[in-house]
A protein has these predicted regions:
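Acidic, Ser/Thr/Pro/Gly-enriched alpha-helical scaffold modules and adjacent low-complexity linkers
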Residues: 1-166
Length: 166
């Protein structure tokens, strides 16, 4: 990231236009579910579409994509721990503006998990409070100990709400 001053290479392959065109109003629903820190499972084939949808959604939240260092393990919390409160605001400096607004949001830090393609070996990580995962394995859909709040089905292009969202 340091060699690319804007971090544009992180956003390569994420097509927000395609995401909004394909998922329409459901794009906003998914974004709200991520912001509310719900348990979201994206299910379907191919894996490329699975990951592209998730990265496109995460890229809609300002400054989150370059700050996913805690996303792979629920016990990590470096983003929240290393955060410093902005003392001044410089409108000409993007980093200053983001820090003043409290961004990036710590959505995937402590007790949260983000894995665009989650293998069966990481099923224990789904015991945390919030997660966004992608899978092609039906075992995840029928897991009793850590059921998702929402299943996003790539085949049917629909959201299935399994739990009450409040």
């Amino acid at each position: 990231i340091s060699s690319d001053e804007d971090g544009n290479t992180l956003y390569m392959g994420t097509s927000i236009r395609e995401c909004v065109h394909k998922w329409r109003f459901r794009t906003l629903m998914l974004l709200k579910l991520i912001l509310l820190q719900k348990r979201i499972m994206v299910y379907g084939y191919p894996v490329e579409h699975l990951c592209t949808l998730q990265y496109s959604l995460v890229s809609l939240i300002p400054a989150l994509l370059p700050h996913l260092q805690d996303a792979a393990a629920p016990e990590l919390n470096t983003l929240s721990r290393d955060r410093v409160k902005a003392e001044s605001l410089r409108m000409s400096d993007r980093d200053s503006l983001l820090a003043y607004m409290g961004l990036p949001l710590p959505l995937f830090s402590h007790d949260a998990f983000f894995q665009p393609y989650c293998p069966l070996q990481q099923i224990d990580n789904l015991r945390c409070k919030t997660w966004l995962i992608g899978t092609t394995n039906q075992i995840f859909k029928h897991q009793k100990t850590s059921q998702p709040d929402v299943i996003v089905d790539l085949y049917k292009m629909q959201l299935s709400f399994l739990c009450l969202l409040y």
